[in-house]
Amino acid sequence: STTSLADLFFFMNNQFSMFFPMVLFILIGSLFYQEYKNKTYINWITYGFSKKKLFLSKVTVSVVIGICFAAVLFIAFGLLVAILNGAGRLTGGIALFLKLAIGFGIEAGVVVFVTTCLGAIVINLSRNIIVTSVVGVIYGFVSCLFIGSERGFVIPGSFAYRVSMFFSDKSTYYEVPISATIGGCISIVFCFIVLFL
């Protein structure tokens, strides 16, 4: 039997939107936790190095790893699409795949940046990898809970998911698209302002 590219992307993207934020929380938590566990953070600030530089360097490393990981996931998805397409078991062309790539890129960018910054704040406030991991799991579930809500655009991960799915099926976007788009963009900007203060 054949399946559509849009359905396959829907399945993959649902898994991505739930589990990827959890992975990012654990990643950024681990990067900072190593500093606290090895007491290298104390050395860093005792020698007069900027705490802000340390924070931004860890966030940058996590963002780069997160973007690379998301790219690898989409490349693996592309290989699966190529295999299924070659076997004649997939409907949907290259034009749809390219649109999905744009949508996924937008979603991954928003999720990586917002989640990494949020995770960095949680680990620096708690200094506990378990607390950070639990908050990451909660954030992943909360993002997924708001995906279907018409007010879900206030959660950046939920908004990014709906934007991504718009490239697959326009009917999955918000009923009031202009207000939701403006609100979602404002929520992302607001998150960045709060996270970088």
Regions found by a protein language model. Give the residues of each.
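Terminal transmembrane helical anchor/hairpin motif
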Residues: 1-11, 133-197
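Secretory targeting signals
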Residues: 1-26, 56-125, 166-183
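Short N-terminal micro-motifs specific to bacterial/archaeal maturation
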Residues: 16, 32, 45-46, 151, ...
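Transmembrane alpha-helical segments in integral membrane proteins
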Residues: 20-36, 41, 113-131, 187-197
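Helix-loop-helix units of permease transmembrane domains in multi-pass membrane transporters
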Residues: 31-64
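Membrane-interfacial segments
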Residues: 33-36, 40, 80-92, 126, ...
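Short glycine/serine/threonine-biased micro-segments
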Residues: 46, 117, 134
